[in-house]
């Protein structure tokens, strides 16, 4: 069975790839566990100087795996399990933001919900020109994690943060760049090449 997160070392750059392309890299419990582990290993590895986070297939990350969530809900979920899930998501954000190695995000296709949060947790991001991102959580009866409620107001202001979270509107890469949420916007086919170049600096 394929790992939901793969790890590749290349000249001091550790490439972490979300690897559920058939699900547009939707986040399930296995991916959360695998990414937490991969980040811990990478942060502890002296050969890795920079982390590059990307997604396999047609999207960076389409957010929570709703099919998996619905299946869990049908079986009944204990409050403690919900808290464990949220804590594990927060642990990823802490590693991305507070780890001692810079993180470059290579974002293409969709970055949705927690996937958008992970993109915003990166120190530098390269977005494909056709990329789109949004927060659907409130419409699904959920709430954003990943520290975005602390991060976003500092960058885009309180009014825009409220719009992004409460309305769940979709943003293109150029708009995100104008808001200070994307460093570089390049043709889709140049995302990985550009991200590697940035990471190599």
Model-derived regions: residue spans:
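Terminal peptide-recognition signature
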Residues: 16, 20, 34-35, 53, ...
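Conserved CoA-thioester-binding segment of acyl-CoA-metabolizing enzymes
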Residues: 1-56, 94
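A short, glycine- and basic residue-enriched loop/turn
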Residues: 21-24, 58, 63, 130-132, ...
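Crotonase-fold acyl-CoA enzyme core
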Residues: 94-201
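Hydrophobic alpha-helical membrane-association signature
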Residues: 31-34, 85-88, 191
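Glycine- (often His-adjacent) and acidic-residue-rich active-site loop
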Residues: 55-95, 111, 141
